[in-house]
Amino acid sequence: MEKTIEIDGKKVRFKTNGATPLRYKAQFGTDYFKEILKLAPLQKLQGDNQSITADDMQHLDFEVFYNISWIMAKTADPTIPEPLEWLEQFDVFPMAVVIPELQDLMLSSFQTTKKN
């Protein structure tokens, strides 16, 4: 699955595939699926109920989101630099915009395909 979104005036491609969880573990040393589960409070951003409480925010580890974003960008474009250098190219990395855009990609690793 692939998606292109605009961040800080730049078109950025994000992609997931079967190797995404293994690439994540190789880069960051932690399990991709466990890390995604840490972002569960973000599900509140889907649909009409788009509010996250201060308590939800306290339990979020935004480093996980930055890491997952980088893995998806690296999967789409193997030439991008290491995570910190990649993030430094953006003057802003608006979480409120990026998170909802990438949720489907994150969740695609958990979904099955429907058989006809």
Language-model features: locations:
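Short, surface-exposed, low-complexity cationic segments
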Residues: 18-37
